[in-house]
Structures are given as C-alpha cells and as structure tokens.
Amino acid sequence: MKFTKTVKFLGIEERKMKDGRLFAVTFFADGTAFTVYVVEKCADLSKLLSLQFGKELAVTFRLAPYDNAWKIKFASLA
C-alpha cells in the first residue's frame, strides 16, 4: 500500500517483544489517529525520530507487510 498524506506525528513507543523490538508509531491524518508498527529500527525510522512530533507535513510512504507487522518505507518527506 502506498500513501501520500499530510500527517501529524503524535508519538512513538518502543515495545519489547520476545524476539526483538517493535516500534509503534502513531500518526494523525484525515481526522483519524492510526498506528503503524515498525519491526526494526532502520534508517527510515531514524528519519521519523528526527522529526518534530505534532508538526504537520506531507509524507509519501509505503507500508509493506512484514512478519505480521508493517514496515514503513519512506519515499519522501516534504
């Protein structure tokens, strides 16, 4: 799935799982808050962590299913 949305980042939470770490990233877009689960701390997540939460910005990203979770693949950060 590929999305281009103006989103507001609300928060990120690290959850310890039996086989590693899972990161829950919460966005607010189109009047709805939604959470994406990121299965690894990759370069894409580092970009996300460097953003100022609560700031609205246009993001193009693709969600790829990975081991019963979603992995964020950023195409661009406006």
Please give the residue ranges for each predicted region.
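OB-fold/S1-family single-stranded nucleic acid-binding modules
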Residues: 62-78
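Short nucleic-acid-contacting surface segments enriched for D/E, G, S/T with interspersed K/R
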Residues: 42-60
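Beta-strand elements of well-folded, non-transmembrane domains
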Residues: 11-14, 31, 63-65
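Structural detector for short beta-strands of small beta-barrel domains
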Residues: 1-21
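A mid-sequence interfacial segment
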Residues: 9-11, 38-43, 78
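OB-fold (S1/OB) nucleic-acid-binding surfaces
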Residues: 17-40
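Short C-terminal domain-edge/linker segments immediately following a structured domain
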Residues: 35-43, 67-70
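Hydrophobic residues positioned within well-ordered beta-strands of beta-sheet architectures
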Residues: 5, 24-25, 57-59
